Amino acid sequence: MGKYFDELERAMQWLGQQPDTMFLGQAVEYKGTAMTNTLVNVPRQKLLEMPVNEEMQMGITNGIAVAGTVPISLFPRWNFLLCAVNQLVNHLDRLKAYS
């Protein structure tokens, strides 16, 4: 493909080799987006396929991070990412107060 894609694929492979990472999102386990092709060499047990629900995905991403794993959350439909902002603004930033 191109240099950008090659570097993105190389970065995803490196992240996939790290013991504390996890990939989640739409089309991470199954073909569907260009990002799927960057995950071909990532171990399958590190991939968590998500339904189309950006806010839920961000909430799960926050929980995974709080539990100590490094989440790599893929949002192929970036124009719907604004739906996930609630989880960041109204939940993650108040985590200390809730704990």
Where are these regions (language model features)?
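Thiamine diphosphate
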Residues: 1-99
